[in-house]
C-alpha cells in the first residue's frame, strides 16, 4: 500500500530535507519514525528537497507499507512522535503507481522580506531583513519578465547538475506587505537555488543597480557571473505543491504549458 503524507515544517534547525551523514534533516526524522513502526528501514520519496533553513508550508512525501493502520492513526502516531518544528497535516492512500516527484506538475514558493531601521530578533530565521529602501513597483515589473518558458542557467547555482535548465514560470510577482514585501513565484519546477537567485536579483533592481530591461539580456547570456548574488535561505517558504494538473489549470488558465518531471 502506498501512502501520501502532507507535512509542514520550520526549516531553521534542519540541514535540509534530504538525509545527510551528519546532521538533522526532515527525511531523517520521518525515516527514523517509520523504522520504529515497521521494525525495518522504510524510504520516503518527497515532492521537493528543500535546502538548509528553508521552510515548508506544504510539502508531500510517499512511502510504501504492508501495515494495516487507519490513516487517522498514521497521522496521530506521527504527530505524537515528531518534534515541534514538523507537523503532519494529512495522510491518505494513493495508487501504487503514484510518485510524489514525477506526479508533481508545479510548485509555489514565497520569499518573505521585512524592512525596518533595525533588525528584529523575533523575525530572525523567518524573514530576511533588508534595511535599505527599495522600489517595489520596479521590482514587480522585473519579476513579471520571468513569466513564461526560459532557460534559467544564469539564475541558478553553478552546482546544478540537471542537463536541461529550461523551466516555465506561471507566476512571478512582488506583493507589498505591512512590513516589507513577499516574492511569490509558481513554476513547473525550480533549479538549485533558483528562487533565491531570482530574489537577490530583484533586490538589486529595487536598489537601482539593475534595470527591468536587463532581464531578457541576462536570461539570454546564461552566465551566472552576471547575477552573482544569492538571497539567504531564511525567508524562503515552499508554499504549495501541485499534484493535480487540473488545479494548476484552474489557477493559471487552460493555455499554460504543463511539464511533467520525466520530461524535464
UniProtKB/Swiss-Prot annotation:
Substrate binds at residue 109. Disulfide bonds: none annotated. Keywords: Isomerase, tRNA processing. Transmembrane segments: none annotated. Its EC number is 5.4.99.12. The keyword Transmembrane helix does not apply. The active site is at 51 (nucleophile). GO terms for biological process: tRNA pseudouridine synthesis. It holds the Pfam family PseudoU_synth_1. GO terms for molecular function: RNA binding; tRNA pseudouridine(38-40) synthase activity. It catalyses: uridine(38/39/40) in tRNA = pseudouridine(38/39/40) in tRNA. InterPro entries: PsdUridine_synth_cat_dom_sf, PsdUridine_synth_TruA, PsdUridine_synth_TruA_a/b_dom, PsdUridine_synth_TruA_C, TruA/RsuA/RluB/E/F_N. PANTHER family: PSEUDOURIDYLATE SYNTHASE, TRNA PSEUDOURIDINE SYNTHASE-LIKE 1. Formation of pseudouridine at positions 38, 39 and 40 in the anticodon stem and loop of transfer RNAs. Homodimer. Belongs to the tRNA pseudouridine synthase TruA family. HAMAP family: TruA. NCBIfam families: hisT_truA. This is tRNA pseudouridine synthase A. It comes from Staphylococcus aureus (strain MRSA252). The gene is truA.
